């Protein structure tokens, strides 16, 4: 069942969906002051929503106390201007605990991450997410990826569940997504169910996802190059195909290819990008590792090229 307020704010977003990195100090501890700055700058740069403590925010590496502090800080810095959603994951009991912590911290919704490690059947997966959704009044977006892959029938069941308002796809199986969208549309006509492209660097595949009926996407690039992410989002929304393809060819494809050169770069390279832009958010926590120096140098060049493309587009 749809939560109208959140659905209305996300259906046609005014800007990219922002997944902030989590800031750490030199001792590896949480740096809330820098984190607040990161979130505040993102909202001011045009984010349509903040997804705190999710994959890019190293949800896996945060203690419950750190998680609650970050979500509360994101809510305070957003100050009601945009909705704030928080990650919730691990096994059912812990996911419920994180959901309740997010509610207490003032979050507007949840991104329900895949269960930790286990390979479950469809019935168990549906039950898990239903229990998470029942734990709080917060609307829930279910994250499909890795060990949480759904049949179209299971997504229909989830779409019928009170509190479950959408599906974020991090799998990249376009055939499956087409069948999921079709099944929900057929079985629940008129139901407003949200779909998100949640692949790393989702801009690279968003033209294909949009054609399937998946209009929303996450933007890790927004963390370190908001001007590029906003320009792409605007061009996509306005049907400016020339700008879309220019940014895909000149910025996003090179970035995706660089990201593929290291395990964990979907987070580590983004965090390096934030540091390159002048905000010291610290390093990633283990087991992730920092990008190689040569890759950071290449990232500098890619960002500079993207900025040139945006400036050229603005002058047209």
Swiss-Prot record:
Known InterPro entries for this protein? Answer: Aldolase_TIM, DapA-like, Dehydro-deoxyglucarate_dehyd
CDD domains with a match to the protein in the record: KDGDH
Record SUPFAM superfamilies: Aldolase
Q: In which pathway does it act?
A: Carbohydrate acid metabolism; D-glucarate degradation; 2,5-dioxopentanoate from D-glucarate: step 2/2
**SMART domains annotated for this entry?**
DHDPS (SM01130)
Which Gene3D superfamilies would you find in this protein's record? Aldolase class I
- GO BP of this protein: D-glucarate catabolic process
Q: Which UniProt keywords apply?
A: Lyase
Q: Which reaction does it catalyse?
A: 5-dehydro-4-deoxy-D-glucarate + H(+) = 2,5-dioxopentanoate + CO2 + H2O
Q: Supply one GO molecular-function term.
A: 4-hydroxy-tetrahydrodipicolinate synthase activity
EC identifiers of the protein: 4.2.1.41
Q: Please report which protein family the annotation says this sequence is part of.
A: Belongs to the DapA family.
Do you know which HAMAP family this protein is assigned to? KDGDH
Output this protein's name. Answer: Probable 5-dehydro-4-deoxyglucarate dehydratase 1
- UniProt source species: Streptomyces coelicolor (strain ATCC BAA-471 / A3(2) / M145)
